[in-house]
Amino acid sequence: YELIYSHPELMIDWFPVLGNHEYRGNTQAVLDYTSISRRWTMPARYYTKAFEDKGTTIRIVWIDTAPMMDKYRNDSATYPDACKQDLQKQLSWIDSVLTSAKEDWIIVAGHHPIYAETSKDDSERLDMQKRLDPILRKHKVDMYICGHIHNFQHIRRPGSDIDYIVNSAGSLARKVKPTEGTVFCNPEPGFSVVSADKKELTL
């Protein structure tokens, strides 16, 4: 991380989330890296922060998605920390944060997608749709950003105003094709930039 993302303009705060690869190892070490790297800003497994610029406010809620899926919780040999997490506590926290959020824009970010075109196990997304998506829809979240699939997908689902974004990969990009609700998809590696004013959230 430090060697790859070494450009001077990248010497800014980074706000990570835990993913499936972190859950294969020592997840606490990922949090502890906050005390070693000035850029690495991860105060907890899930956390939130509000930003303001030129009168526009954004709240970002970073969440821990691996414990939301039975696949990880039921495989303690491979993902030893997943079953130890209090899932209901996190879901209640997300609901509480979104209930009190008053910012112009609300973005939730986690590792795993709620909707995506992928060859990965369908149960992952079904668990996310069952446990997380109803909370996001209830609070009319503007955007859910994730990774995991190693390509870019922008999805809008019927009955929801949420923009579901699968962010592209920094490496190991995978092929992708449209699925239900696809607005745009692309297999190229890269990064996304989000900007906002009072009227528009732009990706």
Please place each PLM-identified region on the residue numbering.
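Extended active-site neighborhood of metal-dependent phosphoesterases/phosphodiesterases
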Residues: 1-106, 120-127, 131-143, 151-197, ...
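C-terminal structured domain segments across diverse proteins
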Residues: 112-115, 149, 171
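Aromatic-lined ligand-binding clefts that engage carbohydrates, nucleic acids, or primary amines
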Residues: 109
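Short beta-strand and adjacent tight-turn residues that come in two discontinuous sequence segments
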Residues: 146
